[in-house]
Amino acid sequence: MPQETAPEIYLIARPAVDREAMRAYLSAVGGESWLERRDSPGPGGDGELLVEFAGRTCYRSWEPGLNPNVTRVREDPRAYLNNILKSAHGSVLEHANYTFALHNVSRVATHEIVRHRAGAAYSQESLRYVRLVDIGFRVPPVLEPVRQQVLELVERLEEFQVSAAMALHLDEEGIPFHVKKEVTSALRRLAPIGLSTDIIMTMNLRTLRHVVQMRTAAGAEEELRLIFGRVGEIMKAEASGVFQDFERDQRGCWEPGFPKV
């Protein structure tokens, strides 16, 4: 029988700030006292530090007096980020990127995920190069009444992948790689679109806010709700200031207090 899988979500990369370079810049513009106040690690890490740095650059709001138009400076990072969200100054969120490894997600899911192009980058396991031997598969909850039939069908498709590769002599010595690639590419057409695959996904904070909201909405595709429900949990903990307005309702929808940022 095919291997039954479930999506696994890993946050594998987050922003890292060069504090010495940041300090040198701030010294040049007269804002070094801000970093002294702000340099203690906060719950939002370097991602939120970078967002705040970008935002304060726009108004030269490192401290009162640097910009004659600025008479009051929010010193609390969370309050500052809340004002960024409230004023829809979303461009500064685009400086901070986070990378996720999505393991055992279906190609149904990845086909929808990669439609989010702005502020995102993807690298997906290629079935043109990676030959299918074991087909991982997750039975969607709505198909539970016909689970056995689903798994038997996937098993037959898996057996075909193996038998076809044998019949086409793919593992015989001396078969050129370009031949293996051509056959592997052809065989993927006989694989279920629901098979499990992996994709690396990078998104900036602005995009993450948008996608988490859209893909956990009540009408979103079931597996996408599962994947981005978990992404929402991770980002609520990872960037608690930028996601401070997000709340999860009883339906599992992540809803922001400020939807247009």
Residues covered by each model-derived region:
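Family-specific signature for flavin-dependent thymidylate synthase
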Residues: M1-V261
